[in-house]
Amino acid sequence: MKKVSSKLLAVISILVIAFAAIAFAGCTPKGSKTKIKVVEAALAEDPIAFGMAKTEAGKKTQEIVNAWIDKNKSTINDLFEEYAKMTDEQANAKNIEYKTEADPAKKDKQFVVATSADFPPYEYIASGTQKILGVDIEIAAKIAKELGKELVIQNMDFDAIIAATAKKDSLIDIAMAGLTENEERREHLYFTKVYKVDKQVMIVNANNKSFDGMTTDEINKKIKKLAEEKIGNYKLVIGAQKGTSSFGIAEDYAKDNKKIEASSYPNPSLAVQDMKNGRIDFVIVDALVAKVLMAKFNK
């Protein structure tokens, strides 16, 4: 009996150690080496434009910027191509001069831009610096130069931009933040001509095969199915940047299904990091932004 008991104890000890190892592994932070990929099918297509207050001054700015867009379509395309390939070293070498505070006494001498510098390649803070760069910032600098005005860049949370720009007494001339023009936003702002059409896509972990090769309709059905497969109180969690059209899509999924949750983030990078760490299932973002995030997280 003692001999049998000893064997049993030995087996139990091995099992305890094994389960402890598994439990410890489960507590190890996920995601540090997890790569990500983009599901290519578009969930939606977005017209990207600049916004300004519904005032006489806003109308004048709209006309000026529309004329600039018409004359500089090739320049805009070149900027998107440049920023798609830009390295940290190249970004750090750029020198766009701007101030960060608008001066009421210089209202007619400054070109004041509201942005949210967390949305590459449209606008972002260059790695290891405090410099705000991006396609929108380059365009702003070129317009300010043509107008003979000093460029002012006011960086703020994305979901504060529309209200800050729309205020009748605002010093902001224009919102340049990868803004999708839509009916709701047109209630608050004038919009320029569309300067870029982007699409909304999903980012998933690279080992996630759920949506491979699917059309948009197939993706929508698959999302519903995955949500239904969640057990108990668990939900399918979709991450996106707060206040964006990406988050609007996530909310639409959640509105139609109680097993889906839309989770908002200050910027897309944080959403992707949470996905890599297993806290959410996937992220919705603009396709151009997705490319930049792929380069960042798959280094």
Please annotate each region the language model reported.
Residues 22-26:
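C-terminal motif of bacterial Sec signal peptides marking the signal peptidase cleavage site
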Residues 34-44, 141, 145, 150-226:
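Acidic, polar ligand-binding/catalytic clefts
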Residues 42-91, 137-141, 145-146, 205-221, ...:
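Extended ligand-binding regions for polar small-molecule ligands
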Residues 31-62, 66, 90-94, 117, ...:
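Periplasmic-binding protein-like
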Residues 68-82, 86, 99-100, 104-179, ...:
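Extracytoplasmic small-molecule ligand-binding "clamshell" domains
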Residues 117-120, 129-145, 197-269, 287-291:
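Bilobed "Venus flytrap"/periplasmic-binding protein-like clamshell domains
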Residues 28-44, 160-163, 177-188, 248-253, ...:
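A ligand-binding cleft/hinge motif common to bilobed small-molecule-binding domains
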Residues 30, 50, 65, 143, ...:
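Hydrophobic residues within well-ordered alpha-helices
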